[in-house]
A protein has these predicted regions:
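FMN-binding flavodoxin-like domain, especially the glycine-rich phosphate-binding loop
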Residues: 1-5, 10-122
Length: 122
């Protein structure tokens, strides 16, 4: 089964997670959201994953814009993985709501705690 991972990573934490997932799944490609957001997107995969950091208890704007641009079909397995310094808060619920506006279901959502990168906090 082919898997496409769409990743947004500012500090590298989410990219590491994407690479780890890709290493465990056969036929997996990682796409950088900033590099492909203005291109035609290859959705010819059985599984679609979104991997991104939590920004201020939610999704980064670029990920929201990217999901809004996609024309997903309901026969795909859709999952999201968010990386966070502490808690994901309502981020995965936000992903679910964003996809539901397109008639798509989020099949699974995961959060992975990572080292914090919010400099003001430290």
């Amino acid at each position: 089964m082919k898997t496409n991972l769409f990743c947004y990573s500012a500090t590298g934490n989410s990219l590491i997670v994407a690479k780890d997932i890709a290493a465990m799944l056969p036929e997996t490609q990682i796409f950088s959201i900033p590099k492909i957001i203005d291109q035609d997107i290859d959705l010819n995969a059985d599984n679609i994953g979104f991997i991104f950091p939590v920004y201020f208890s939610g999704m980064p704007r670029i990920v929201i814009d990217f999901i809004n641009k996609l024309e997903l079909s309901i026969d795909k397995y859709i999952f999201a993985v968010c990386t966070c310094g502490s808690l994901p808060m309502g981020t995965l619920l936000q992903v679910q709501k964003q996809l539901s506006t397109k008639g798509i279901t989020l099949n699974a959502g995961f959060s992975i705690p990572m080292p914090g990168s919010y400099i003001i906090k430290y």
